[in-house]
């Protein structure tokens, strides 16, 4: 027998007042331009949006609660499924939080490999953004070209960890593997080729009349709005605020490499597009410097700390103590000291951070993920008001959200 629910549907609590001159429509959750299971309730006056309400939760999986029932190492593959376009960024942010909790310092080579993975992942994320954003506006050629280059980078990532999207490539205390043979040569070959591809994209879009009409003065975000709504990443830098966590609070070896922080002052969709295009070039600059840093590092890729990190495979197979220590870590999990940490990082979409409260056991007492797409999606409530229905899809694509990290 079905028990009647006392809870009213979510949409019944939304204060939309139907008037003769206005119309309420649903954009999504099954819509090709929603970039996931996002539902937007829009109130229109003609074709102009007068009220907007994003409705999320269609892909909610309870990841933060899942973390409370897993040992610390078990949760790493789950982070892949948050922003599944930038899995390495999620892996790193989580591992960095646990390492800070345990007081671990990773080897220099592991830090370089992490930076390589993060910047390659940033490029693949930005390429997917440009491809889908251009497709939303009708630029089919750019969509195909971006996927062509993205395949090359995905092949590089796959050569390292065996996966194209859900990498699980990092470990608490370091990384899973050293770089394969000839990896740096292939990466540098891409770094030499990709600037020409970027120029092709810009030749197709920069002065394209339709592209500029659909992006200039569309989706304008002021400095005050960006700060008030918690915007980060390109959403913040496109409004004139030159803030990048890799510069402001350097982690890994970002303080040892030279790179710029692209920004624009107009705050519209076109300004954010120009920031993204420049970020490609800065990532290439970082990758070239990482190739130089890698050559000056010793071969260790995991921290040496038996309480939290397993020994090398060779030691596990030849030394009784290392085997026992590995068995305990895998079956019982590591036990960080009691305390709280929050570690912010600069993911391709903005500030991605993990808060962990440890009670001294092998499982986190509380884990909270601060994901950029969640805040940017909430901003639609104000950002879309006053725009036209035809521009809603263009703005959604430009903001660059992914529902995996919104719903979690």
Curated annotation (Swiss-Prot):
Main localization, broad class: membrane
EC number: 7.1.1.-
Pfam families per UniProt: Complex1_49kDa
GO terms, molecular function: NAD binding; NADH:ubiquinone reductase (non-electrogenic) activity; quinone binding
Membrane topology: Peripheral membrane protein
Subcellular location: Cell inner membrane
Residues in the signal sequence: none
Enzyme class: translocase
Top-rank taxon: Bacteria
Entry keywords, A to Z: Cell inner membrane, Cell membrane, Membrane, NAD, Quinone, Translocase, Transport, Ubiquinone
GO cellular component, one term: plasma membrane
Similarity comment text for this entry: Belongs to the complex I 49 kDa subunit family.
NCBIfam families named in the record: NuoD (TIGR01962), PRK06075.1 (NF004739)
Binding partners and assembly: NDH-1 is composed of 14 different subunits. Subunits NuoB, C, D, E, F, and G constitute the peripheral sector of the complex.
Annotated protein name in UniProt: NADH-quinone oxidoreductase subunit D
Taxonomy of the source species: Bacteria, Pseudomonadati, Campylobacterota, Epsilonproteobacteria, Campylobacterales
Gene symbol of the encoding locus: nuoD
